[in-house]
Amino acid sequence: MAGSKPSAATVDLTGVHVLIVEDDEDSRQLLATFLKYCGALVTMCHSTESALEDLAEYRPHVIVSDLSLPGADGLQFIRALRRLEPEAGGDVPAIAVSAYDKDFTAIEARTAGYTGYLAKPVNLDDLVTLVHDLVNP
């Protein structure tokens, strides 16, 4: 149908490395399982600190990060990420996910440096499509 968005079943993420930063184990596993189903290579971190420490090793194509994280939150994470040089990962596209589906949350996330925003519960088709679009502009 013209104008309809693709379903995740038709989106191929083979070769795309996604870093998920999410403290909730169930949410982290759900996102990872779905992205892997579409062919993505997935690395998972439970905190912003661990994600930043190992970013050079992971070299993801896209980051998916919760905004509500213990310690440094998702906004602090993206600001720290954007201060890095591009070769250190400072220009990696990043998607914020949040249970707080308010207009100001999405605006705040984009202003801080996120490339995209999805409200929880995350529509998995929207996630896969957004990841695909970010690596295939």
What are the residue ranges of the model-derived segments?
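Active-site beta3 strand of CheY-like receiver
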Residues: Y58-V64, L69
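Charged docking surfaces used in two-component/phosphorelay signaling
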Residues: Q29-Y37
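Non-catalytic signal-transmission and effector/linker regions of two-component phosphorelay proteins
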Residues: M1-L19, D125-P137
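Conserved acidic carboxylate
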Residues: E22
